[in-house]
Amino acid sequence: MPANLKDGPLKQHSVYVIDDDRDVRRSLSFMLSAAEIRSHPFGSGLDFLEALPDLEPGCILLDLRMPQMDGFEVMDALAERKVDWPVIVMTGHGEVPVAVRAMKLGAVDFVEKPFSEQALLGCFNQAFGLLKDREAAGRRRREAHERAALLTGREKEVLRSLLAGQSNKEIAQSLGISLRTVEMHRGNMMDRLQASSLAEALTLALEAGIEPAQAPAG
């Protein structure tokens, strides 16, 4: 196994194996254990979803053809719960159209049974890189929301106007306040957002979901 697979992001997260075939679960758990990757097997999608609230973020290896609740239904349930962990789907040989359907629903990759250890670990390596990026983006959004929550109403109005591309003079006119007052609110806004530049402040605003102000009528 390449060193970058064994020592990279794979060792930092868990793999959740969802397959109704006990032999497949055992085989995959053995393979992942040999690669020093934490694995957690589930015999059904229902079992996984029941345990989901207590699980740490990880990669999901999902069989599409299962009784009671198939892989597509599991993916729908994850979307409803706003869980965006990377999903790799397992398909039978020649079931590429089925895999394509799964990828349209959000799966990041697919493997055909029987699959090689090298191919599967390669999929995991890419999936965990994606998970790391998503987690970082989530942290940035949360931090942006926390900082934006510190803004006063007037400071947020100034920020929304800046997002709309207005100058300080235009903001003063649209809000009916003096230019000096706009500059004061803008400075306070920058301090509360801990932004060192206007570009950084606007990026934080967008990550916090703040919408640009509407253009003044007339």
For the regions a language model picked out, list residue spans one by one.
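Conserved acidic segment of CheY-like receiver
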Residues: P9-D23, L28-L32, G45, I60, ...
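Acidic catalytic/metal-coordinating carboxylates
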Residues: G43-S44, D70-D76, G94
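Short amphipathic alpha-helix used as the core "switch/output" element in two-component signaling
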Residues: E50, F72-D84, R101
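Receiver (REC) domain active-site loop signature in two-component systems and cognate sites
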Residues: M66
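C-terminal output helix
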Residues: E95-P97, V111, F115-F124, S174
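Basic, Lys/Arg-enriched C-terminal extension of HTH/homeodomain DNA-binding domains
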Residues: G187-G218
